[in-house]
Curated annotation (Swiss-Prot):
GO molecular function: serine-type endopeptidase inhibitor activity
Region span, Disordered: 1-27
Bias type Polar residues, positions: 8-25
Name this protein carries in UniProt: Inducible serine protease inhibitor 1
Induction, per UniProt: By infection.
UniProt entry tagged with the keyword Membrane: no
Purpose: Inhibits trypsin and the toxin protease PR2 of M.anisopliae. Does not inhibit chymotrypsin, subtilisin Carlsberg, proteinase K, porcine pancreatic elastase and the toxin protease PR1 of M.anisopliae.
InterPro entries per the UniProt record, alphabetical: FPI1 (IPR021066), Ser_Fungal_Prot_Inhib_sf (IPR053741)
Keywords assigned: Protease inhibitor, Serine protease inhibitor
Keyword check for tRNA processing: no
Length: 50
């Protein structure tokens, strides 16, 4: 998750705030929706689509 966030920040320096939010989102999804995390192969991928 951190690596993806770092790459995103490098690609889009202007959207540093979005990168910070995207880094926090995966942890929330994993804790709140364990069932969805099991169905999704990679929670960060879902966040990336959003």
């Amino acid at each position: 998750d951190l690596v993806x966030g770092t790459n995103f920040x490098k690609n889009n320096p202007x959207s540093t705030r979005v990168a910070a939010n995207s880094x926090r989102s995966p942890s929330v999804y994993r804790q709140x929706x364990x069932x969805h995390a099991k169905k999704a192969a990679x929670p960060p991928a879902v966040v990336t689509l959003l």
